[in-house]
Design a protein with these regions (language model features):
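Conserved thiamine diphosphate
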Residues: 128, 177-210
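Glycine/aspartate-rich loop-and-adjacent alpha/beta segment that forms the canonical ThDP
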Residues: 204-266
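Generic beta-sheet signal
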Residues: 52-54, 130-134, 161, 219-229
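Short acidic, glycine/serine/threonine-rich loops at helix termini
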Residues: 66-68, 95, 145-147, 173-177, ...
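Glycine-rich beta-alpha junction loops
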Residues: 34, 60-61, 168-169, 228-232
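N-terminal capping segment at the start of a domain
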Residues: 7-23, 166-168
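Cofactor-binding active-site loop characterized by glycine-rich and histidine/acidic residues
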Residues: 14-17, 29-155, 181
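A short alpha/beta connector and helix-capping loop motif
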Residues: 143-168, 222-226
Length: 266
C-alpha cells in the first residue's frame, strides 16, 4: 500500500500524543487515519486562500488530524505533546479559535454537514471553485441534523461537498448493530439524491481514485463515500475492540507492543 511508512508514523504520533496526555480517543482516530491523510496530504493546500476545506464532524478523532498536521510540519516543534493540555492549541475536540489551521470547531456530533453547506454557499457567492470534505462517524448518523443536511444538499444538488462516513461499526459504548437495527444507508442517501459509493477506507489508492472522480464532477450529483474501516486499525489487540474507543495511558507492555506492531508495518 502507498504511504505505509507515513501512515505508520502518523499512527505512532497519535498513540504517543494520547499516551503522553493520559487521555484521548484512540480507536476512532486510527479508523479514519487514511481518510484524513489522503485529504490533507493531497487535496488541502494551506497556502492557497481559496483552498478546499475539511470539516471533521466526528471531532473526537482530533488526535488523528493533529498528528497529520504534525506530519505535514504545520505544528510547532513538540506541540503534539500538548494535546488536551491547559491553554494548548490542540484541544480534545477541534477548536478553531485556538488552532487556525482548522476550518471549524466540532465535538457536538451531527453538525459538520450543516457547516459544510454554509461553506459551499459561501464559495458560490465568492465564486470559489473549491470543495468541502466532511468526515462523519457511522454512529453520528443517528443525529437528525445529519439527515436534514443530507436532504438539503440533495435537493439543491450541492456537488462540491464530499461526504465521507467512517464506517468502523462502533460508537461510544456499543456496536452500531447493538444500538440500532440494520439500516439501509445506501437507500436512504440515494433517496435524497446522492451518489453512494462504498469502499475500503484503509486503501489510499481507492480513496484517491474516488476523490479524483468526484472532483471531476463525474457523477453530476452530490456524493457520499461509505468507508469500511476498522476501529483501532493498525494494532491487532485494538482492532474491532471498543475498549479502546477512549483511553487513558496504556500499560507499558501494551504501549510497547502497539509501537512494535506499528513499526512492523513499514
Amino acid at each position: 500500500m502507498r504511504y505505509s511508512i507515513d501512515l505508520s508514523l502518523v499512527r505512532k504520533k497519535i498513540l504517543n500524543s494520547i499516551q503522553n496526555t493520559d487521555s484521548g480517543h484512540l480507536g476512532p482516530s486510527f479508523s479514519c487515519t487514511e481518510i484524513l491523510f489522503v485529504i490533507l496530504k493531497k487535496y488541502i493546500n494551506f497556502k492557497d486562500k481559496n483552498r478546499n476545506k475539511i470539516i471533521l464532524s466526528k471531532g473526537h478523532a482530533a488526535p488523528a488530524i493533529y498528528a497529520i498536521f504534525d506530519y505535514l510540519k504545520l505544528l510547532k516543534k513538540n506541540e503534539l505533546n500538548t494535546l488536551r493540555k491547559f491553554s494548548s492549541r490542540l484541544q480534545g475536540h477541534p477548536d478553531k479559535k485556538k488552532l487556525k489551521l482548522l476550518d471549524f470547531g466540532t465535538g457536538a456530533l451531527g453538525q459538520g454537514l450543516s457547516v459544510s453547506i454554509g461553506y459551499a454557499h459561501s464559495s458560490k457567492l465568492l465564486n470559489k471553485k473549491n470543495f468541502i470534505f466532511c468526515i462523519l462517524g457511522d454512529g453520528e448518523l443517528q443525529e437528525g441534523q445529519v439527515w436534514e443536511s443530507a436532504m438539503y444538499i440533495g435537493s439543491n444538488n450541492i456537488k462540491n461537498i464530499i461526504t465521507f462516513i467512517d464506517g468502523n461499526k462502533f460508537q461510544n459504548e456499543f456496536s452500531i448493530k447493538e444500538t440500532l437495527k440494520e439500516v439501509n444507508l445506501r437507500g436512504k442517501w440515494e433517496s435524497f439524491g446522492f451518489k453512494y459509493i462504498e469502499t475500503d477506507g484503509h486503501s489510499t489508492e481507492k480513496l484517491e481514485k474516488i476523490i479524483k472522480n468526484i472532483m471531476s464532477y463525474k457523477y453530476k450529483k452530490p456524493v457520499v463515500v461509505y468507508c469500511n474501516t476498522i476501529k483501532g486499525k493498525g494494532v491487532s489487540f485494538m482492532e474491532g475492540n471498543n475498549k479502546y474507543h477512549s483511553v487513558k495511558k496504556l500499560p507499558l507492555e501494551q504501549y510497547n507492543e502497539a509501537l512494535k506492531e506499528l513499526d512492523g508495518q513499514k
